[in-house]
Regions:
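Non-core capping and flanking segments associated with repeat-based/extracellular domains
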Residues: 1-191
């Protein structure tokens, strides 16, 4: 497939990851619905690539160690099993200066069953972090360098919790509890 550039690869079902990536000249935006990797070593190598967009479907289990390894601007995980303590560790890692390219993380928490919703506990999630609560009636526009699967580049954020890193970088945590959702927005210096 010489001369063809594929920017975003979305997979559905099984396919030969290594051959496909090589043939498509390693797209920078990838959506997986299932885990295509045969070993943790190959998965770890994949995580440390410089990607723009990475979205994991419900057939993909992402651990805290995985999240800490992923080098990407946008990370999306459907049916995440990561809970408050894991995310607290991740946030503290970012505050120490890791993941400079990160712009957005969106995790949809898995439910125990479809009737029982387990919302994120803000106190556990933000434990030990200095944050400012932003009122739910305050709406801000977040500009993404990479469009989502619908092609949108602008996200309206209502409320949240602002946290500032020592170097001045600001990020906002937004928790939605009707379908437990954790989002982290890292503001660029010109927003």
């Amino acid at each position: 497939m010489e001369g063809v550039t594929v920017k975003r690869l979305c997979t559905y079902g099984q396919f030969e990851y290594e051959k496909t990536m090589k043939a498509l000249n390693y797209p920078s935006e990838i959506c997986f619905d299932t885990n295509q990797f045969t070993s943790h070593e190959s998965l770890s190598k994949f995580y440390i690539q410089n990607l723009d967009y990475l979205d994991f479907g419900d057939g993909f289990l992402v651990t805290l160690d995985d999240l800490l390894l992923i080098n990407c601007k946008h990370i999306g995980v459907t049916f995440s099993r990561l809970r408050e303590k894991h995310l607290n560790i991740y946030l503290k890692s970012w505050l120490r200066g890791q993941k400079e390219e990160l712009e957005h993380v969106c995790l949809l928490a898995s439910r125990i069953n479809w009737e029982e919703v387990v919302p994120y506990n803000k106190e556990v999630l933000l434990k030990g972090l200095k944050y400012t609560t932003v009122s739910d009636d305050v709406e801000r526009l977040f500009y993404c360098s990479v469009p989502d699967t619908d092609g949108k580049r602008v996200v309206a954020i209502k409320g949240g919790y602002d946290i500032r890193r020592k170097d001045g970088r600001l990020f906002t945590i937004v928790l939605q509890n009707d379908f437990p959702r954790f989002e982290m927005f890292v503001w660029s210096n010109d927003q």
